[in-house]
Amino acid sequence: MTESLDAERMACWRAYIESSQRLFTRLEDDLRADSDLSFADYHVLVLLSEAPGQRRRMGELADRLVFSPSRLTYQVATMRKRGLVAKEACPADRRGSEAVLTAAGLLALREAAPHHLRSVRAHLIDDLDDAEVACLTRVFERLGRRLRADRTASSTPADK
């Protein structure tokens, strides 16, 4: 049987779960009110805007978003209907495809970004001092590295 968490660690876990859900919901609500973009829409647009040529392979984009391939396909399809992204064959490998940021998608991102930044500041960043920002950055970067490594290890066939 798995050992239970002590009271301090249980309080940490529960505080994280509730606050992260509330934060995500608030950021999502603010984004939709200010821009008619979902959080997933916004994240796709950001990742494409930062990529060389404003395009990414679908598999890489799914990995960065922590989406299943089918979820990303659906997400990109809904964004294509709204003209925010295009889907094109990968120039280097015609079997693969890439999501590509459109001019309309870039405009939507540029219009939404200041509102989203205000929301992030209001609901998270401005409530933290410099030491707390540094601590959270260390904790979540370490956690992200470990979870990415765990995911990579679990998706790689074991050597026989």
What are the language-model segments listed below?
Residues T25-S68:
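N-terminal helix-turn-helix DNA-binding core of bacterial DNA-binding proteins
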Residues E132-K160:
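Exposed, interaction-prone assembly regions rather than primary DNA-binding/catalytic cores
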Residues M1-S35, D130, A134, K160:
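N-terminal leader segment of winged-helix/HTH proteins
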Residues M58, V76-A77:
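Short, hydrophobic-biased segments on the C-terminal half of alpha helices
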Residues L23, L27, L65, A108-D127, ...:
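Alpha-helical linker/hinge and terminal dimerization helices associated
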Residues A77-C135:
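Charged, amphipathic alpha-helical coiled-coil/dimerization segments
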Residues R14, V46, R110, T137:
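A cross-family signal for key residues in well-ordered alpha-helices
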